[in-house]
């Protein structure tokens, strides 16, 4: 595997996490409190759209350990390459979180806990896992439909469609779980902050959702080429 592939995964994950964390910190009272949930959703969605279009032809534009695991489950990436992808994604997310921690005031970082996706106070463990499964399932279906399935590729909206899915997932699920859908997005700020509460749930839910969606699309929806 060429180094540029892993660099693309690093940079694409950096795009997503820097924009997302930055938007959350910008919405704090310490910075100005503007934007709110809609701005946060748009920041994540637009950044991912650009990153997918920029790097999709290089690495496939996973930028998410759950997506990589779904591709592994359907034989679209080898186990060794999947591990390398995930390490690159975690490094990109951590670099983005560190950059945001250095740029924004410490009061904003503390107020938003560096943008770590966390559940509402009333949400149970089952709610967190269930919502993250649903949100990531929808994201992975969008990825397969626009970037994997040749019938979707012909429409040429892959990055835009995937980014919009992340945006509406955040609008729908953000108030419940923080709408991570991406273990790297959770890992980066958690590592910088040393805050691991609920962290495991943000691996389990997205990975289950992504693998389920990948298997459903691969075995039920995707047209198989005749042998």
Regions found by a protein language model. Give the residues of each.
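Membrane-interface helix-loop junctions and terminal tails of multi-pass membrane proteins
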Residues: 1-227
